Amino acid sequence: TAVGCGIFTPYLENLTVNPSGTFEGTAITASSTDSMGAVISYKNNAGTNVLNTDIVLQLSADNGSNYTTATLVDNGNLDSQTKVASVSDVTVTAGTQLKYKIEFANQASGSKEARITGVALQY
């Protein structure tokens, strides 16, 4: 039988954390609404993120033409690392195409990093 030895060298890529940024969900078709709510789950990958300052949620019912900033409320921990925040009854411009946008601020590699792990919309 043959016996061999090999060396595996994984490819490493340096990641850069941007101090600010946004991401937007895809539209969900619903009955016409002018009031929305949401639940998000997130992790403080590094440091402690402040809701409504470092993590900002915006809601839209008109496919993102008009966003309304929501005031997130801390709902405690889902598990030892995952936190939950929510908002209800946010008045938005009426529509049938529900979307969310999350904005990040004050992020710094190794000292403050937010990781959003889930988003649920209510209408």
Predicted segments, located by residue:
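Beta-strand-rich ligand- or partner-binding modules
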Residues: T1-Y123
